[in-house]
Amino acid sequence: EQGIQMDRAKLLSEISRYASGKCDQRVVKTWINESAEMIGFVREIMTEKYGVNMIYTYGDEAKWPAENAEHNTDYMYPEIEYTYDRSSGAARNELLLQYIQELGYDVDFKTSLAKLEKNSDGRITGIIAQSTEDDHFIRYNANQGVLLACGGFPGNPYMMEQLDPLGTSVTTACSYSPADKGYGIRAAVWAGANLDKEAAPMLFDRGIVAPGVDAGYVDSDSAFGGKAFPGKIRQFNPGTQPFLKVNRNGERFANESCPYNDIVYAAAHQPGRVYAQISDANFIEDAKRFHTIGCSAQTRNLGEDYFAQQVENGEKEGCFFKADTLEELADKMGFTGAAKDTFLATVERYNELYDKQNDEDFGKPAYRLSAIRTAPFYGCWLGASLLTTEQGIAINEKGQALDTNNQPMEGLYITGDMSGSFFANNYPCLM
């Protein structure tokens, strides 16, 4: 509708590169070739049937700035992002449930998947579920097959620590659904399905925490598995801006103009696996120039009022700090002794690089450098915020689950976060 043409071959290559080749390109092609049809199907339900507007981002707002390729890797992203206007009607899932019910079907939400059932030929014939109300078991027969869409395993610390020790070690906050405990993945594996061997967490650099807090799990009596991440704020969106980042020694350690998860992985090599973001009074002005894309764009698009609310939330939790001088900010952030001296010297050096409009130290594009000279000065400590996991059950291009010999499992289909064969190492995210 907007006249935008996507280079499908380049997009396939980009997704494969992001996964270091650890994907099935035929599965990726299914997404590339059929995602538009799927969006059209959902839009027909949401807009034409229920009058809810589908909205999308395109053009400059969703386009990767060409200047990044002068120094950084030349990333490529699909130019149109679809979502729906929440203000124009009922919640999306409520409308989809209504659509299902109008077709004569029903959904039972008060169940938990216990196991898959299969016949003597190995075909999946149904499931055993357990009631979340009184724990009784229910058998569902499925003559045409079973489609599992049970989400990932971010809410299961046992699986996180075993399957993704690196991602777990750099995470400070969570924005996932606690219900995503990996039960669907476990049931499929018990039935003989093949689980991807590479972790693929969806990490955002927005896990704001108080000074002195390390990344990784802490004990929690109220959390599933007795463990939780320490952050009190699910996602601190202003954290996804390419401002100066330093470790606990006050040292800069990476190019901050990078995809969401790159800086948190770089912090895996730093004390406590956390880092501090430093900026000044020109935060929003700088953010508009940085022009990050994706969901991080809401900080620049919503402006000063939104930023002020985010700051207030951070201050209430003892995680965000304002100061009239850099020395005062260093004290509030917990820098002492040699670390404080190094911090102040790092800021001075960063200002020099800004004046030169040339990042001689780490190669950040000039338009994403910023001066740190105008009070008030801002600072906070950050790690990763875990949204979900994408390490899932291996599938073919038809969505069929594969067994450990990579052969289709008759009667079993996988979709959503629990499907695999697509991602590895990380989730392709924006900058």
Regions found by a protein language model. Name each.
Residues Q130, A142-N143, L148-C150, R248, ...:
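Short, well-ordered coil/turn residues at beta-beta hairpins
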Residues K115, T336-N426:
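A glycine-rich dinucleotide-binding beta-alpha-beta segment and adjacent secondary-structure elements
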Residues E1-I45, N53:
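Redox-cofactor-proximal catalytic regions of oxidoreductases
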Residues I185-A187, N194-F335:
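An anion/pyrophosphate-binding glycine-rich loop and adjacent beta-alpha core
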Residues W31-H136, P157-Y158, I208, D219, ...:
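Conserved redox-cofactor binding core of oxidoreductases
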Residues E133-H136, Y140-D214, V264:
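Glycine-rich loop(s) and the adjacent beta-strand/alpha-helix scaffold that form part
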Residues S177, P238-T240, L387-T389:
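Short, small/polar residue-rich loop motifs at catalytic or cofactor-binding pockets
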Residues L203-I208, C258-V264, A384-E390, D417-M431:
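Glycine-rich phosphate/pyrophosphate-binding beta-alpha loops
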